C-alpha cells in the first residue's frame, strides 16, 4: 500500500491532549492553533473523545491535522473517519488498523520500540513512526534503530519529550515530536495551555529555527 505522507508543517509537533473533556475542547484547541500548533491528537482514553475530536475538526483551519491517539481497533478507525479525523496515532503496530486508516486518507503514526516493530509498521504503510517512550530509548537508541529503516520514513520522538531536550534530539536529526504532559495536563485552562504552547514553540524555534 502506498504510504500517505505527513503534510508539510513548519513545526512538526503534535499536541497530545490526553484527558481533554468535550466542554474544554474549543478553548484548549483554539489556544493551541492560535499559538501555531497545526497537529492535534486527542487520545481515545479521554472522556467522550470523539465529541472533542469533532469539535476540533470543525474549528480547525484548513491545513491542520486533527485526529486521535490510542487507536487500537478498526472500529475506532471507522468512528474517527466519521467525525472527520485525519490523524491516527496508536501505541502499537496493528497492520489492519494502519491499512484501514490509510484507505480512509489518514496520516498514520503507530508506536514502536524495537526494530521488528518499526519494520512491521513500515511494511504496513505507516506514514511515520512514533518512537515511544523516547525517554527510555533516548537519542542513542533511536539512532541505532533508524539505521535499518527506510530513509524517507518520518520519525517522531514521543514520551518524556519537552523543550528541555529538543537539542538532544536535534543532534541526531530528529525534529518531529509528540508533546503530552509538558504541554497539557487534564484540567488546565486554555490560558495556561496558551502560555505553555508559546514557551514550547519559542524553545523549538531556538533550536530548529535555522533548519526549517
From Swiss-Prot:
The gene is dgoA. GO terms for biological process: D-galactonate catabolic process. One of its GO terms (molecular function) is 2-dehydro-3-deoxy-6-phosphogalactonate aldolase activity. PROSITE patterns: ALDOLASE_KDPG_KHG_2 (PS00160). The record marks 158 as: Plays a major role in determining the stereoselectivity. Coiled coil: none annotated. This is Probable 2-dehydro-3-deoxy-6-phosphogalactonate aldolase. Its EC number is 4.1.2.21. It comes from the Bacteria. Keywords: Carbohydrate metabolism, Lyase. Belongs to the KHG/KDPG aldolase family. 2-dehydro-3-deoxy-6-phospho-D-galactonate binds at residues 18, 70, 130, 160, 180-181. Involved in the degradation of galactose via the DeLey-Doudoroff pathway. Catalyzes the reversible, stereospecific retro-aldol cleavage of 2-keto-3-deoxy-6-phosphogalactonate (KDPGal) to pyruvate and D-glyceraldehyde-3-phosphate. The record marks 18 as: Orients the nucleophilic substrate. InterPro entries: Aldlse_KDPG_KHG, Aldolase_TIM, KDPG/KHG_AS_2. It holds the Pfam family Aldolase. Disruption phenotype: Cells lacking this gene fail to grow on galactose as sole carbon source. It catalyses: 2-dehydro-3-deoxy-6-phospho-D-galactonate = D-glyceraldehyde 3-phosphate + pyruvate. Transmembrane segments: none annotated. Pathway: Carbohydrate acid metabolism; D-galactonate degradation; D-glyceraldehyde 3-phosphate and pyruvate from D-galactonate: step 3/3. The active site is at residues 41, 130. PANTHER family: 2-DEHYDRO-3-DEOXY-6-PHOSPHOGALACTONATE ALDOLASE-RELATED, 2-KETO-3-DEOXY-6-PHOSPHOGLUCONATE ALDOLASE. Homotrimer.
Amino acid at each position: 500500500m502506498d504510504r500517505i505522507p505527513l503534510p508539510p508543517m513548519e513545526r512538526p509537533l503534535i499536541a497530545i491532549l490526553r484527558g481533554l473533556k468535550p466542554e474544554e475542547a474549543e478553548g484548549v484547541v483554539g489556544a493551541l492553533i492560535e499559538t501555531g500548533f497545526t497537529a492535534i491528537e486527542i487520545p481515545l482514553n479521554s472522556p467522550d473523545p470523539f465529541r472533542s475530536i469533532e469539535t476540533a475538526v470543525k474549528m480547525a483551519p484548513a491545513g491542520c491535522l486533527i485526529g486521535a491517539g490510542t487507536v487500537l481497533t478498526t472500529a475506532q478507525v471507522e468512528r474517527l473517519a466519521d467525525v472527520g479525523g485525519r490523524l491516527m496515532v496508536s501505541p502499537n503496530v496493528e497492520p489492519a488498523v494502519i491499512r484501514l486508516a490509510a484507505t480512509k486518507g489518514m496520516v498514520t503514526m503507530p508506536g514502536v520500540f524495537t526494530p521488528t516493530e518499526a519494520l512491521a509498521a513500515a511494511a504496513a504503510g505507516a506514514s511515520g513512526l512514533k518512537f515511544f517512550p523516547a525517554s527510555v530509548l533516548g537519542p542513542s537508541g533511536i539512532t541505532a534503530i533508524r539505521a535499518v529503516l527506510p530513509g524517507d520514513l518520518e520519525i517522531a520522538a514521543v514520551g518524556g519529550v519537552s523543550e528541555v531536550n529538543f537539542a538532544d534530539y536535534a543532534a541526531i536529526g530528529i525534529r518531529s515530536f509528540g508533546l503530552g504532559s509538558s504541554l497539557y495536563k487534564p484540567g488546565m485552562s486554555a490560558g495556561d495551555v496558551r502560555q505553555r504552547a508559546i514557551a514550547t514553540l519559542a524553545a523549538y524555534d531556538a533550536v530548529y529555527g535555522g533548519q526549517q
